[in-house]
Regions:
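Conserved Switch II/interswitch segment of TRAFAC-class P-loop GTPases
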Residues: 98-117, 141-143
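Conserved C-terminal guanine-recognition region of P-loop GTPase G domains, centered on the G4
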Residues: 113-130, 138
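NTP-binding/hydrolysis catalytic cores, primarily Walker-type P-loop NTPases
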Residues: 181-205
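Structural beta-sheet core signal
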Residues: 35, 80, 103, 135-137
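Hydrophobic anchor at the start of a short beta-strand
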Residues: 32-33, 78, 132-133, 161-162
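P-loop/Walker-type NTP enzyme "switch/lid" segment
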Residues: 2-13, 20, 24-96, 175-183
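Beta-strand-loop-alpha "switch" segments that mediate conformational coupling across diverse proteins
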Residues: 141, 151-182
Length: 205
């Protein structure tokens, strides 16, 4: 079983967007996928409720937010959307389950500083647990100074940058229908699929 955890201590950085897209990718590969939502806002769970029956199936993993247990048997791929403020013992408990951790980061100096200590803590715990960590830049406009600052910060961490995802209405419009870029005709989302390619390769590796 492959367990992917999406984590960042700050709210509003794109954790649910990334979680649902990753689940959608696994489902499009015809894996038995469960999406767990440990966040108080339950955005991923809401997204699942909007997902049409005609789309690749993704099952909801019902979680006790205070006690994250192992996923049910028969599942091949699990994606866990975690709450803001994740650290300490709770972070360690989550990482006991995880094979890979994906950290979304936005090109904002406030987000960067808020995430710095978390990445240091995460790297120490993950090294002991032999968990892989990857960073994804979210809502990035490559032409801006903020994007340059994000790139410089990420490079300084020594952690791998999987990709930079652009700021596009595609994610918002698809989320409103319970869908992902992997559920629609490729020609509609060519640029986005191109940005997802290195993430998908890392997830499959």
């Amino acid at each position: 079983m492959s367990v992917v955890v999406v984590a960042n201590p700050k709210g509003g950085v794109g954790k649910s967007t990334l979680s649902t897209q990753i689940a959608g990718y696994f489902a499009s590969r015809q894996h038995a996928v469960m999406l767990g939502d440990a966040d108080r806002q339950q955005s991923s769970k809401l997204w699942l409720s909007l997902r049409p029956a005609s789309a690749w199936p993704i099952t909801s993993w019902e979680l006790d937010r205070d006690d994250i247990a192992k996923p049910p048997k028969g599942t091949t791929h699990v994606v866990l959307d975690t709450p803001a403020g994740l650290h300490g013992k709770r972070l360690k408990d989550v990482l006991k389950l995880a094979h890979k951790v994906v950290v979304p980061l936005q090109p904002s100096v406030f987000d960067i500083f808020a995430t710095q200590d978390f990445l240091n803590e995460l790297a120490q715990i993950a090294q002991a647990a032999k968990t892989q960590i990857g960073i994804v830049g979210m809502r990035v406009d490559e032409r801006t100074r903020a994007a340059e600052q994000l790139r410089a910060f990420v490079e300084s961490t020594g952690l791998p940058v999987l990709s930079y995802l652009r700021n596009t209405q595609n994610y918002i419009q698809l989320a409103a229908r319970g869908l992902t870029v992997f559920d629609v005709a490729p020609e509609r989302v060519v640029r986005d699929l191109g940005q997802w390619q290195p993430i998908c390769e890392w997830l499959d590796n």
